[in-house]
Amino acid sequence: MSRLILASASAARRSLLQNAGLAFESLPVRIDEDAIRQSLITEGATPRDIADALAEFKARKATERAPGHLILASDQILALRGEIFAKPRDREDAARDLHRLSGHTHHLYSAAVIYEDAKPVWRGVGTARLSMHTHSEAQINAYLDQAWPDVSSSVGAYHAEGLGAQLFSRIEGDWFSVLGLPLLQVLSYLRMRGMVAP
């Protein structure tokens, strides 16, 4: 029987799968996310499609290293009024991102793709809308004093499941997608494959 391989180094994604009782192995892969994202933006791709494409690139890369198994890869895109955000390069970049998100509602798109035998066999995208309180520069800096560098690898420079929850007035949609993986959709597919108890 095929093993489930998570093509990610994300502790949050590993935790979601572990807490859901799944047996899997982690196989982190590296792709040039910035170049791929920028190319897709230039082509006019939607945030949803960009998340899906990045997840597929990761799955394809991992299947080269683990043929014959189910490869699960995921990616998350943050969009504010059509602008796509990347992970912050440094603390100053994080402060700028939080300032731009402050007082607005943005969307998170978390895509997952499963590859088997070098081709995609399933894909899904979860979405969430996050409304952020208006924050002063001093409030943003006080938040980053506590949260940085833990949030350096997170688009938007926050962890909504932790201290970052204080930044928001409202979160709607798929909570698991806020955490980086459309978990319920993934579990539905794996249940059909007999990899999850009924």
From Swiss-Prot:
**Pfam families attached to this UniProt entry:** Maf (PF02545)
Q: Where is the active site?
A: 75 (proton acceptor)
Biological process (GO) annotations? nucleotide metabolic process
Which cofactors does this gene product need? Answer: a divalent metal cation
* Gene3D superfamilies reported for this sequence: 3.90.950.10
Molecular-function annotations in GO:
nucleoside triphosphate diphosphatase activity
Read off the InterPro entries from this record: ITPase-like_fam, Maf-like
| Top-level lineage group | Bacteria
Q: Is Magnesium there in the keyword field?
A: no
Mark the transmembrane ranges.
Answer: none
Q: Where in the cell is it found?
A: Cytoplasm
Which reaction is this enzyme known to catalyze?
a ribonucleoside 5'-triphosphate + H2O = a ribonucleoside 5'-phosphate + diphosphate + H(+); a 2'-deoxyribonucleoside 5'-triphosphate + H2O = a 2'-deoxyribonucleoside 5'-phosphate + diphosphate + H(+)
Q: Does the keyword Magnesium apply?
A: no
Q: Under which main EC class is this enzyme filed?
A: hydrolase
Q: Residues of the signal sequence?
A: none
Identify the GO cellular component terms for this protein.
cytoplasm
Keyword annotations = Cytoplasm, Hydrolase, Nucleotide metabolism
Known function: Nucleoside triphosphate pyrophosphatase. May have a dual role in cell division arrest and in preventing the incorporation of modified nucleotides into cellular nucleic acids.
Describe the family membership recorded for this protein in Swiss-Prot or TrEMBL: Belongs to the Maf family.
What's the protein called, per UniProt?
Nucleoside triphosphate pyrophosphatase 1
* Organism of provenance: Jannaschia sp. (strain CCS1)
